[in-house]
From Swiss-Prot:
PROSITE patterns: RUBISCO_LARGE. It comes from Lingulodinium polyedra. Its EC number is 4.1.1.39. Belongs to the RuBisCO large chain family. Type II subfamily. PANTHER family: RIBULOSE BISPHOSPHATE CARBOXYLASE, RIBULOSE BISPHOSPHATE CARBOXYLASE LARGE CHAIN. Binds 1 Mg(2+) ion per subunit. This is Ribulose 1,5-bisphosphate carboxylase, chloroplastic.
């Protein structure tokens, strides 16, 4: 009977007529009012709100905890200045409930609260409440400040853990009935808290050093993804590495490649090492390889990493480690970062679209996911192609690259100061080829990124060596156009002018003719080409392996 008297709102809704049936004649009391826990934790009230026009007209009820979990007098400027809170900006629709009440419910569920007041709450507990400090119902925006002490720390070294940040900020609040949808669009980490995360150990500077590049503006690292992504056995896989390595810098496993029964690591990696040694000897240039060590079991990841480094031997610094960071999770990321701090940590985001896609109204955005990758230690992460390739994206996604590479950068809502945290290198992939690169560089403003072009190099009509070379040449073409070498002409005309004396780029025009027609109108006449459109890569004899 005590439960009926304590949770009377539930009693009324679930057990109509309970008062008469139990012989209770008292008035409805405030929830838990008869329980005196040193007079702590005053009870919350329930409020109802009419659903929005066009939605259900049923009046729904939400727990209003705004008196405790909201403080709209707080200013973002002061919160940032004090440096004691992680700030999170959400897009959350009104969903038929009072907006502030729902936002406060999110803050409560994401910190110290629950759906009822509990007797164990004390004065200290309230000091670590998450607080709603800003709402804009019309634009469906809310911001919550999370006190740093809320977040879990390692018992081994006191370091911070991203899984704790995500558990609170994007955990149970994603499944609450009064939150129709909510998505994180930006997150701010105070510098004092950032210092407790690992951050990257290596960056593109390490690649430039190995490749003998300028350490300030070393430019594009021309890379590829071995294609087909699955189906090659060890020897053909090694031959593909050799073919690309004749013209390119960097070769990576595709994200599903690892230790398939038809291409086991103990047979494939030796073939890769042999191919790389041959390419280095023949070209006089260093080569890099990114090996996939992703696994469910941390012990398996470590075993893979140790085996690969043993095979590379004196060339160990030429080897990066790839981890499918989204699907394998933060534990796998930290295993790689902490056990192999001397290796370039290649973060692949396969699967991220399940929560980051613009079509998804829950989770977080690609910007947030990418920013988190720098915090937890990625040396490089795939960022799509900013609408210049086949992946979903927009030219404005260059803000993602700025957040990864700069020491201070603005996001959709917050300006983040990194205070010396090593940069994370944008890795671009997905439908890219030489012809698409100049406009990409112009939009980004520089070419200090890693390219991993699979079809864009292995699809070149003359082979992967020429495909890789064409990408390097188009970076040079963009730089020359930028410097005014070709006079006052458009970027497309500048690239065409460069192509007149560079056969590899000219071959890209002939290979990717749909791109040629769309990006470089009039290219055939300007290059003096009179032939018909040919089937992509038809003239490349794969059996010769592009020696």
């Amino acid at each position: 009977m005590g439960a009926f008297l304590t949770f009377q709102k539930d009693s009324d809704q679930i057990y109509p007529g309970w008062k008469e049936k139990l012989g209770y004649t008292g008035e409805s009391s405030v929830q838990a009012a008869s329980f005196d826990w040193q007079k702590k934790a005053a009870a919350a009230a329930f409020v109802g709100a009419q659903a929005r026009t066009g939605r259900s007209t049923v009046v729904r009820r939400a727990l209003d905890q705004s008196s405790r979990y909201a403080d709209l007098s707080l200013t973002e400027e002061d919160l940032v200045k004090n440096g004691k809170h992680v700030l999170v900006a959400y897009i959350m629709n009104q969903g038929g409930y009072d907006y502030l009440a729902t936002a406060a419910h999110v803050a409560a569920e994401s910190s110290t609260g629950t759906n009822v007041n509990v007797c164990t709450t004390d004065d200290f507990t309230k000091t670590v409440d998450a607080l709603v400090y800003y709402i804009d119902p019309e634009n469906e925006e809310m911001k919550i400040a999370y006190p740093v002490p809320l977040f879990d720390r390692n018992i081994t070294d006191g370091r911070a853990m991203m899984c704790s940040v995500l558990t609170l900020s994007i955990g149970n609040n994603q499944g609450m009935g009064d939150v129709e949808y909510g998505k994180i669009y930006d997150i701010y980490f105070p510098p004092s808290y950032l210092r407790f995360f690992d951050g990257p150990a290596c960056s593109i500077l390490d690649m430039w050093r190995i490749l003998g590049r300028d350490m300030t503006d070393g430019g594009l690292v021309v890379g590829t993804i071995i294609k087909p992504k699955l189906g090659l056995q060890p020897k053909p896989f090694g031959e593909a590495c050799y073919a690309f390595g004749q013209g390119g810098d960097f070769i990576k496993n595709d994200e599903p490649q690892g230790n398939q029964v038809f291409c086991q690591m103990n047979e494939c990696i030796p073939e890769v090492v042999t191919a790389m040694k041959a390419c280095i000897k023949e070209t006089g240039s260093e080569k890099l390889f990114s090996a996939n060590i992703t696994a469910d079991d941390p012990a398996e990841m470590i075993a893979r990493g140790k085996y690969i480094l043993g095979q590379f031997g004196p060339m160990a610094e030429n080897c990066a480690f790839l981890v499918d960071g989204y699907v394998a999770g933060g534990t796998a990321v930290t295993v790689a970062r902490r056990n192999f701090p001397k290796q370039f940590f290649h973060y692949h985001r396969a699967g991220h679209g399940a929560v980051t896609s613009p079509q998804t109204q829950r989770g977080y955005t690609a910007f947030v996911h990418t920013k988190i990758s720098r915090v937890i230690g990625a040396s490089g992460i795939h960022v799509g192609t900013m609408s210049f390739g086949k992946m979903v994206g927009d030219a404005s996604d260059k803000g993602i690259a700025y957040m990864l590479q700069q020491d201070a950068a603005g996001g959709p809502y917050y300006h983040q100061k990194w205070e010396g945290v090593v940069q994370t290198t944008p890795i671009i992939s997905g439908g890219m080829n030489a012809l698409r690169l100049p406009a990409f560089f112009e939009n980004l403003g520089h070419s200090n990124v890693i390219l991993t072009a699979g079809g864009g190099t292995f699809g070149h009509k003359d082979g992967p060596k020429q495909g890789a070379t064409s990408c390097r040449q188009d970076e040079e073409a963009w730089k020359l156009w930028k410097a005014g070498t070709y006079g006052d002409v458009s970027l497309s005309d500048g690239v065409i002018e460069y192509a007149k004396t560079h056969e590899e780029i000219k071959g890209a025009f002939l290979t990717f003719q749909k791109d040629s027609d769309q990006i470089y109108p009039g290219w055939k006449e300007k290059l003096g080409y009179t032939g018909e459109s040919s089937v992509q890569a038809a003239s490349f004899d794969w059996q010769k392996k592009a020696a």
